[in-house]
Amino acid sequence: MKYRDLRDFLSLLEQRGELKRISQPIDPYLEMTEIADRTLRAGGPALLFENPKGYSMPVLCNLFGTAKRVAMGMGQEDVSALRDVGKLLAFLKEPDPPKGFRDLFDKLPKFKQVLNMPTKRLNSAPCQEQVWQGEDVDLSRIPVMHCWPEDAAPLVSWGLTITRGPHKERQNLGIYRQQVLGKNKLIMRWLSHRGGALDYQEWCEAHPGERFPVAVALGADPATILAAVTPVPDTLSEYAFAGLLRGHKTEVVKCLSNDLEVPASAEIVLEGYIEQGDMAPEGPYGDHTGYYNEIDNFPVFTVTHITQRQDAIYHSTYTGRPPDEPAVMGVALNEVFVPILQKQFPEIVDFYLPPEGCSYRLAVVTIKKQYAGHAKRVMMGIWSFLRQFMYTKFVIVCDDDINARDWNDVIWAITTRMDPSRDTVLIENTPIDYLDFASPVSGLGSKMGLDATNKWPAETPREWGRPIKMDEDVRARIDALWDELAIFSDKDAKR
């Protein structure tokens, strides 16, 4: 199922009982967060607050609050199908030339999908049905959520920030939180390694003193939103990947105030610029770690135009201790990562980012071990291959007889196959999440690798233990006898 815009997606969700309209007046100050948090933890529907207190614009929350809805947003019916999305990304990252006619025929569907990658530019678009500019620009018209009691101010959480570096043809889409600073000002909290920040750094070097054009789209179609959080190759625009997911080209329109292109069907678009050197202290905010983060300085985004659809919907979320919406999305996107990693490291059997580990700070990898030291090579590969794992603090590597997604299995492997001194890798002074207050200094910390694999002769002089396993003939005989033994009553079974 493909969706042309957010409203198309919401219509389907409502048909399937995956959207709940809330007509009671609910305050964007704290109340929406509490309702959304309770709903998400119960695996509940997306929420459309139709009457936010003090506003006429409805607020959409919990859109991707289940892995199933993330898969649906990517045009799939099941989370397991996201492996196919990962295979497509792996192909785009390092395409292999066809090895013959049969191979060419097998790859034709992928080549056909590539035809949907270029954007389609429109002369007019729904996102520009209403326009405010100059003195009429007022962010207080938008029911921006104030999520937690000690948050510094209301926070734009689901804005797709659109930028272009001075030496690049493609545009970058990234999701960066934005603190409301005034009627026409936001603080753009992007980390130095993210695409928007890199575009800005290059602009400052190429055009000293000149304003950096920026646009922020709110309420884009699900394919475009999810493309912005998917590990697309650096050479590929998120718009192009959204076209692949959607099955037709991403429709865009030129901004009114600059040359950036924004999603034509977006509910709201903020246009403006960053003045070089214009910085402001951002935070504190409750974040996906479950803590309030430190205050730090980030660029100020000055909004010159607000454009929107008639009867626009404001798309929002909150972040907090997992599970929250980013953690749920992490569970779904985990399936996308696996084929990408397997393309580079075929020995990887499974890869898991536990949501309770903030969906990126700890990874469990299972491999078909082939030589001594293999686990350490995989650790280094995980940390260096994709930018998304730059901030992964812990990598646990196990053999393929271990279920990476079962802590009972993983803990057993750690406690029986590891020597803490021999099998632990510690690396100091590596890039670390700025939100990680446990690191010695902001943005710089250490990483730990745990080799929980069975050790080969070159790795230990001792005889290695053999796992206990019952004789298969005995198991088969007891299987046949089990029901007759009636060890558990029906009452016990129900317990």
UniProtKB/Swiss-Prot annotation:
Pathway: Cofactor biosynthesis; ubiquinone biosynthesis. Its cofactor is prenylated FMN; Mn(2+). Mn(2+) binds at residues 172, 238. Binds 1 prenylated FMN per subunit. It comes from the Bacteria. Its main location: membrane. GO terms for biological process: ubiquinone biosynthetic process. It is a peripheral membrane protein. The active site is at 287 (proton donor). GO terms for cellular component: cytosol; plasma membrane. Its EC number is 4.1.1.98. It holds the Pfam family UbiD. Disulfide bonds: none annotated. The keyword Chloroplast does not apply. Prenylated FMN binds at residues 175-177, 189-191, 194-195. PANTHER family: 3-OCTAPRENYL-4-HYDROXYBENZOATE CARBOXY-LYASE-RELATED, FERULIC ACID DECARBOXYLASE 1. HAMAP family: UbiD. Catalyzes the decarboxylation of 3-octaprenyl-4-hydroxy benzoate to 2-octaprenylphenol, an intermediate step in ubiquinone biosynthesis. Belongs to the UbiD family. This is 3-octaprenyl-4-hydroxybenzoate carboxy-lyase. It comes from Yersinia pestis bv. Antiqua (strain Angola). The gene is ubiD.
